[in-house]
Amino acid sequence: MFNCHAHPGLYTKNALVCTASIDEISRLSPFPYRSLGSLPGYKTDMSVIENWAKTETFIGEVGVDKRFDNKERQFSILSDILSIAEKHHNIVIFHHVGWTEEFLNTVFSFNLCGFIVHSFNMSYEIYKGIGRHNGLVSLSPKAEKTKFFSTLRERGIIYPFLTETDTETGIEEREILKTWNDKLSSIFHIDMEKEVEDTFFSYISSCPLLGQK
């Protein structure tokens, strides 16, 4: 059972473990699937991110958040990070709150190896658009209360999606993920646990530098 977005806690090889800050870089070292992020509200250092990108597969979580000021600076930082990801063929993990059209236009303007929008809560049409751009969305249990999820139940799955807890790794994280996957399996009549693992590992295998870093 693989968790496609968690945060550093107890050791596990069954989660993509992400940070919101470059200050947490030392906490990532035990985890085989790890991603260094830099979100609004935290310190940013492009040299740290670039050095990470040279030796690792994932960058993120990164993105924009309207709850913080300095919109122009947020998008400037995001573009700089995406330039690094494009250069080094990294898969990017996105955080998104607000400014949706500008965010998507920025993401789609780069030739990324791959990207995942975590805790997805945008529209069904945007979900399809992300799929057409070879991206993936990841759903946490919070997604069940969104309009997108209601539409997904009505219209069905067009592109595969991932599941996550967005919590620290540990016993509770495992329980949350199992409950969420079981619920989705019942709703969509598929083995969600297997579907997520197959989708995630097939997707990251397309990264040209995976296994060489």
Predicted regions and their residues:
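Mid-domain alpha/beta scaffold segments of enzyme catalytic cores
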Residues: 1-213
